[in-house]
């Protein structure tokens, strides 16, 4: 009988907390009515939303399947083991840990497992497309470790493996990091492996951005080359916001596990782990592979449009001249617009992106001279060549002087109307 429970337990969110309910409605409307092109964002399937909002959120389960510190874990053990097995199968790994709450916590566990505080780590320079957790001085990785960096070539903006080798020979790092948050090309994992072996370093690959492309067989896998690989689940993989770790090295398994729990975290988020299991299952499907192919194709169409003569004439270009992955880095150094202004104009026409520094950027980090523009969410929404060509043209025109933002917004509205998002959820608040 429901009357044995307090009314606040059985009431809806709208009844208990109308302010937060309104925020959820407004955000649903924003996601429906804008074109989401932040490279690190995606839309999760309805099945993933169900798991994240499920009763598994009630269960505490410190430890690992079959080795918990709490009773009543027989069903969450099944969920976590499914996630582990599916991650291993998807990426051809011998080991997987699916407990990290985020990519950053996965990275912290990896570093603490393979390096001792004070030892040297070598990663891509943050200002050249690296990540905070790869050695930024204000991040744990830069505070606990002696972080040195390699960069990109000032002419090509590509990672120069000869320069990486020179830095490795100079600094003799204990860990070499291959991975990025804003780099539009594939990395040479075999070359990184050779350099790591030459200097006696562990090779850690952070594939957070391109894991979905790897799962679909559209990007080289780092797993055969790296000692350990970390990732998020919510970017190209299109799962819940969270992280995971995989490796072929079963000898590292105990150290990695102990550095996730109890080293970095306490109780795992079982509702999120169940959602990861579902995301990994979906990532093995043909539909997912098609989506990843459309993701890459969409980014390439955007790069082609932004390198056209009219875009270059207005001061817009693309770093490295194109892309191999799910994102494009627009270079605005010779544009009348800085990164902040360009982000604001695109928001006005209904496209959400983020300003991003370009290598050797003359502008401050909160302003920048670039945009990072990603295609995963639009591919998930169903966009193909026709729609991505239209989006690319809208962006190119929006970044030109005197853009007719009202007309461009109407073109965006036509696209969002043609590809409704989460039609089964509550109506848009917009």
From Swiss-Prot:
Mind telling me what this protein is named? Serine hydroxymethyltransferase
Which reaction is recorded as catalysed by this protein? Answer: (6R)-5,10-methylene-5,6,7,8-tetrahydrofolate + glycine + H2O = (6S)-5,6,7,8-tetrahydrofolate + L-serine
Per UniProt, what is the name of the gene that codes for the protein in this document?
glyA
Segments spanning the bilayer are: none
Which NCBIfam families does this chain map to? PRK00011.1 (NF000586)
Mind telling me which PROSITE patterns this protein's record contains? SHMT
**What GO terms in the biological process aspect are recorded for it?**
glycine biosynthetic process from serine; tetrahydrofolate interconversion
Pathway listed for it is: One-carbon metabolism; tetrahydrofolate interconversion; Amino-acid biosynthesis; glycine biosynthesis; glycine from L-serine: step 1/1
Positions carrying N6-(pyridoxal phosphate)lysine:
235
Task: Locate the site labelled Plays an important role in substrate specificity.
Answer: 234
Task: Name the GO cellular-component terms.
Answer: cytosol
Q: Where in the cell is it found?
A: Cytoplasm
Indicate yes or no for the key word Cytoplasm: yes
Q: Which Pfam families match?
A: SHMT
Q: Which family does it belong to?
A: Belongs to the SHMT family.
- Catalytic activity, EC: 2.1.2.1
Required cofactor names: pyridoxal 5'-phosphate
């Amino acid at each position: 009988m429901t009357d044995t429970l307090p009314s606040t337990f059985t009431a809806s969110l709208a009844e208990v907390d109308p302010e937060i309910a309104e925020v959820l409605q407004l955000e649903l409307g924003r996601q429906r009515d804008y074109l989401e092109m932040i490279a690190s964002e995606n839309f999760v399937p309805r099945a993933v939303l169900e798991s994240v909002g499920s009763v598994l959120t009630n269960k505490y389960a410190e430890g690992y399947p079959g080795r918990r510190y709490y009773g009543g874990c027989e069903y969450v053990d099944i969920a976590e083991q499914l996630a582990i097995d599916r991650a291993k199968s998807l990426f051809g790994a011998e080991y997987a840990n699916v407990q990290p709450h985020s990519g950053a916590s996965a990275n912290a566990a990896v570093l603490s497992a393979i390096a001792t505080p004070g030892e040297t780590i070598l990663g891509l320079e943050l200002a050249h497309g690296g990540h905070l957790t790869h050695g930024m001085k204000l991040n744990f990785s830069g505070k606990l470790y002696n972080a040195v960096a390699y960069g990109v070539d000032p002419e090509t903006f590509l990672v120069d493996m000869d320069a990486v080798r020179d830095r490795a020979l100079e600094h003799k790092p204990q860990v070499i990091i291959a991975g990025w948050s804003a780099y539009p090309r594939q990395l040479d994992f075999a070359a990184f492996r050779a350099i790591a072996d030459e200097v006696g370093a562990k090779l850690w690959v952070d594939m957070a951005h391109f894991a979905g492309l790897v799962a679909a067989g559209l990007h080289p896998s780092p797993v055969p080359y790296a000692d350990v690989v970390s990732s998020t689940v919510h970017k190209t993989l299109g799962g819940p916001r969270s992280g995971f770790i995989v490796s072929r090295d079963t000898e590292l398994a105990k150290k990695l596990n102990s550095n996730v729990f109890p080293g970095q975290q306490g109780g795992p988020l079982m509702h999120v782990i169940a959602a990861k299991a579902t995301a990994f299952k979906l990532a093995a499907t043909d539909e997912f592979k098609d989506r990843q192919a459309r993701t890459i194709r969409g980014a390439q169409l955007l790069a082609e449009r932004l390198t056209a003569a009219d875009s270059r004439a207005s001061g817009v270009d693309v770093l490295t001249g194109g892309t191999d992955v799910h994102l494009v880095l627009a270079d605005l150094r010779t544009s009348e617009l800085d990164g902040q202004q360009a982000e604001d104009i695109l928001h006005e026409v209904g496209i959400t992106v983020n300003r991003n520094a370009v290598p050797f950027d003359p502008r401050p980090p909160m302003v920048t001279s670039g945009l990072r523009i990603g295609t995963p969410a639009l591919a998930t929404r169903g966009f193909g060549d026709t729609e991505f060509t239209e989006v690319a043209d809208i962006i190119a025109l929006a970044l030109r002087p005197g853009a007719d933002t009202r007309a461009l917004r109407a073109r965006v509205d036509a696209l969002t109307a043609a590809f409704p998002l989460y039609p089964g959820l509550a109506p848009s608040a917009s």
